[in-house]
Amino acid sequence: GHGVAHIGGVHEAPNGFRWRIVPERNDSCVLEEGMITTDEPGIYVEGSHGIRTENELLCVKGNANEYGQFMHFEALTMAPIDLDAVLPENMTAAEKKYLNDYHALVREKLSPYFDEEESRWLAHVTRAI
């Protein structure tokens, strides 16, 4: 993932996530309240193709204790994940719960703006797996 600018580059420092630290990118900072970061799970088949589902997340304060201030993320992107591309049998219980909770949030946030037919479509594409 990476930071997001309002009117600027797609990859906005200083926040970012990678499988390894890349010092010259200057995007391995401590996350702060209010930062927007992308979450980009995907699959890449070397030499062939790749696909990502990219959502934007807001960093918010969570619990504080003797170890410090903990942060968590709230989803900003409200769009269904294509369930035709999901293999539930390859997912852990925690991953299924995350997807089902996200889809419930998408329904909650979007359904007030949809008519009856659109709401039926939304219910179908955000059904629990």
What does each model-identified segment do?
Residues 3-129:
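Charged, cofactor-coupling segments
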